[in-house]
Structures are given as C-alpha cells and as structure tokens.
A protein has these predicted regions:
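Substrate-binding/active-site clefts of carbohydrate-active enzymes
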Residues: 1-17, 27-46, 50
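Broad hydrophobic/π-residue packing in well-ordered secondary structure
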Residues: 5-6, 12-13, 17, 22-24, ...
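Conserved alpha/beta catalytic core and glycan-binding cleft of carbohydrate-active enzymes
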Residues: 39-41, 48-165
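The substrate-binding groove and active-site-proximal loops of carbohydrate-active enzymes
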Residues: 1-3, 20-30, 155-165
Length: 165
C-alpha cells in the first residue's frame, strides 16, 4: 500500500507540475522494487525523468538485499546515489568523532589512488574496487546540508598545519 502511494504521488507530481526528476532523502529505507517502479512509471510520462537520492544503508525491517541502498545500486540501473566515498576521500570523514581525519584535499596525499577511483565516478578498479557500473549512477559531492562545511572541516582538521602549505 505504501509503495502504491509513493508511486502514485510521484506520477502526480510529474504529470501535474511537469517535473523531470526527484531526489529521495533517506532512499535506503525504501525497497528496490518501489524505486524501480517509480522510475519506470515516471519515465513513461517524461522520458527525460531522473531519480537520485541518499542510498545510505539505514536500519529497516527490510533485508539488506531489498533496500534501495548504495550497496544495491546495480539493481537500480537508472537511479543515482550520492557518493559518500567521494566526499570522504576529498574532504575527509565527516562524523562528529572523526573531524580530524583528513581527506586528499586537506593533505592526506596517500589517498591519491582512491582519489583516482573517485574521479572516475567510482566506476573503475583504480585504487579500490568499483562501486558503480556507470557514471549515471553516482552523484559526486563534497558538501551539502549535512555536517561541517568544507571551510569548517579544513579549519578543524588542518589547524596544526602552517599557512605555507
């Protein structure tokens, strides 16, 4: 019943407001079949339709294999996921207990091979195992509405560095 409501609501938005895409917050709590159905039904209305969202693996009553999470992105070939891998490699870890963990851009140069992977949309095995089969499945970002801004993160994790660096 919930899946039907989500699908019908999305179709209504596409038909009524002529939107061409949706962003799903906490998409990982929804199931793969529902997300694929949303894409399929909305694409039938607007062939340029796209979906992207937060594919975090959230606690849920669903088995992991059914969740619309980033780890299951291969089962959602037309849906993109925000890449926390890219964010963490570029900026450094963002959890409140990891604010001092640097990323490549803040001086962790040992991450160069993983950075190459990230710059290839995590679609190659350069530096680490590929996460996505196609660049259309990933949204690379460094900053959004969550956690510290890049400036605040740099100030915190690089406070011991000299200004010459």
């Amino acid at each position: 019943m919930c899946a039907k409501y989500i699908i019908d609501a999305c179709k209504f938005l596409v038909k009524t407001y002529h939107i061409d895409g949706l962003r799903f917050d906490l998409m990982g709590i929804l199931d793969i079949d529902t997300m694929n159905a949303v894409y399929r039904e909305c694409c039938a209305i607007n062939t340029d339709f796209m979906i992207y969202g937060e594919g975090w693996d959230m606690p849920s009553f669903l088995d992991f294999r059914q969740r619309a999470s980033i780890g299951n992105n291969a089962q959602m070939p037309f849906i993109a996921h925000f890449s926390d891998r890219f964010r963490d490699v570029v900026k450094g870890r963002t959890a409140s207990n990891e604010v001092n963990v640097k990323g490549y851009c803040s001086g962790a140069l040992y991450l160069i091979d993983i950075m190459k992977n990230c710059l290839s949309a995590s679609c190659t095995n350069e530096g680490m195992e590929a996460m996505f089969a196609n660049p259309r499945n990933v949204v690379n970002y460094v900053e959004c509405h969550d956690n510290m801004t890049s400036w605040d993160k740099l100030k915190e994790c690089c406070k011991e560095d000299s200004k010459d660096i």
